[in-house]
Design a protein with these regions (language model features):
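Residue-level signal for tight coil/turn positions that link beta-strands
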Residues: 55-57, 86
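Serine endopeptidase catalytic core focused on the charge-relay Asp
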Residues: 60
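Exported/periplasmic ABC-transporter solute-binding proteins
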Residues: 2-7, 16, 20, 26, ...
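Acidic, polar ligand-binding/catalytic clefts
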Residues: 29-55
Length: 226
């Protein structure tokens, strides 16, 4: 706002709901992380000029005791072990980008999404709530690293969870900005949406994002120029 004079009104929601808001002409611009679904939005004509801007990664977290013994395993192997051991796994179950990614990983691991199994618990909640529920049920969940860092900051010494799977190439998480198409949604403030998109990829903005840390940990890595 200081640089452009544009006042942003954020709606924090999962990527699936965000993309639906774009199709319903309820927003001017989207910042989302489900590439396949994003490309469908652009192909449908509701999204334009998609730009990749930053990335972080997903991780699998679980109890410090790690009852399923998946620490250090690859993503697919870890999910197979969790399934075979029937350890509790908490899923957002909310059609968010994280949920979409998790489902794709279950398909890679077992060809079948374990939605009817008692150990597979769908919360229908956001990420922080889902991590908290996983801790309560001595279970595992998949989260983005940024939310995990926030969770660590909130819990401090009371944190009963730890990262068990990370830095697997299957866990990459790309964020993109997509203005909504004025031709489909006449009330869209396209100039302001485009201004925000252009601002996100500016070198100065990219540097600011890369330098921003919580608990001395980087939340997002800029990659608009890559």
């Amino acid at each position: 706002e200081k640089e452009t004079g544009t006042n942003l009104k954020w709606v924090a929601t999962g990527t699936g709901k965000a993309l639906k808001m774009g199709e319903n002409c309820d927003v001017d611009v989207l910042l989302v992380h489900a590439p396949a679904a994003e490309k469908k939005l652009v192909e449908s004509g509701f999204g334009i000029d998609r730009k990749e801007v930053v990335y972080n990664d997903f991780i699998i977290v679980g109890p410090i005791a790690d009852p399923a013994h998946v620490s250090g395993k690859g993503t697919v192997e870890a999910l197979k072990i969790i399934k075979d051991s029937k350890a509790n796994f908490l899923s957002r179950g909310d059609d968010s980008g994280t949920h979409k990614k998790e489902l794709s990983l279950w398909k890679d691991a077992s060809q079948v999404i374990p939605e009817t199994d008692l150990w597979y618990i769908q919360t229908g909640q956001g990420m922080l709530t889902t991590i908290n529920m996983a801790a309560e049920k001595n279970g595992y969940t998949m989260t983005d690293r940024g939310t995990w860092i926030k969770y660590e900051a909130q819990k401090g010494a009371d944190n009963k969870m730890k990262i068990v799977v990370e830095k697997d190439k299957t866990l990459f998480k790309q964020y993109s900005v997509i203005p909504v198409n004025k031709a489909k949604c006449p009330n869209v403030k396209l100039e302001l949406a485009q201004s925000f998109s252009d601002w996100l990829i500016k070198p100065e903005t990219q540097k600011f994002i890369g330098d921003f840390k919580l608990l001395d940990k980087t939340l997002f890595t800029p990659n608009a120029s890559k």
